Amino acid sequence: MTTKLAQFLGIMLYVLVAGVMWGTWLSLGRTMTRYDAATFLADGKHMIANLAVVMAVLMITACLMGFAMVALLLRSGSRLAAGLALAGLLLMVGVLVVTLAVEVPLDNRIKTWTLATLPADWQGLRERWAIFHTVRTFLSLAAVAAAVAATLVGRSDRTGTEVAHRPALAGDRDTRSIG
């Protein structure tokens, strides 16, 4: 796989993850703490059913592609780009950790609730979900920014100095010395 293809696929996966996070935060996350129990349960159960499997696949695939981006950029000698890609990968891993450590356990509890069986602290748990969703939303956006930045930096020369490259133009001569 070429480095640019890996970067393209990685960015697309990061954007898909961040897009779902951002859309949820923008449309629901900022107001869901004011939902009554019936609305919270109905919306929550629909979202869990629609997103659980899709997001598991997207987040894991995004992290794997992020690892590929870092490895390919390191191999190409672009340390700055690799560092930015690594930052993006670590941010995306942070999204996965928050999801698995906080959000999924809460989702698994919410899936079992009915209006009759809501725990006494359901509002606090709802608020906890919203807070951690905000955290992972902005981690995912930062991951996208880092991955995009990695594609925008120049390729390193052998000394590690970042250099800008322009495409070769017709009529350009190779000025490298022989020997």
Residue locations for each model-derived region?
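Interfacial segments of alpha-helical transmembrane regions
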Residues: 2-15, 71-94
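Interfacial loop at the N-terminal end of multi-pass membrane proteins
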Residues: 5, 14-61, 105-127, 162-165
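Hydrophobic residues within the alpha-helical transmembrane core of Major Facilitator Superfamily
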Residues: 15, 67, 93, 145-148
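Structural signal for membrane-spanning alpha-helices in multi-pass inner-membrane proteins
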Residues: 21-24, 66-73, 99, 147-154
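Core segments of transmembrane alpha-helices
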Residues: 59-69, 137-144
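Mid-bilayer segments of alpha-helical transmembrane spans in multi-pass integral membrane proteins
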Residues: 93-101
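Intrinsically disordered terminal tails
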Residues: 157-179
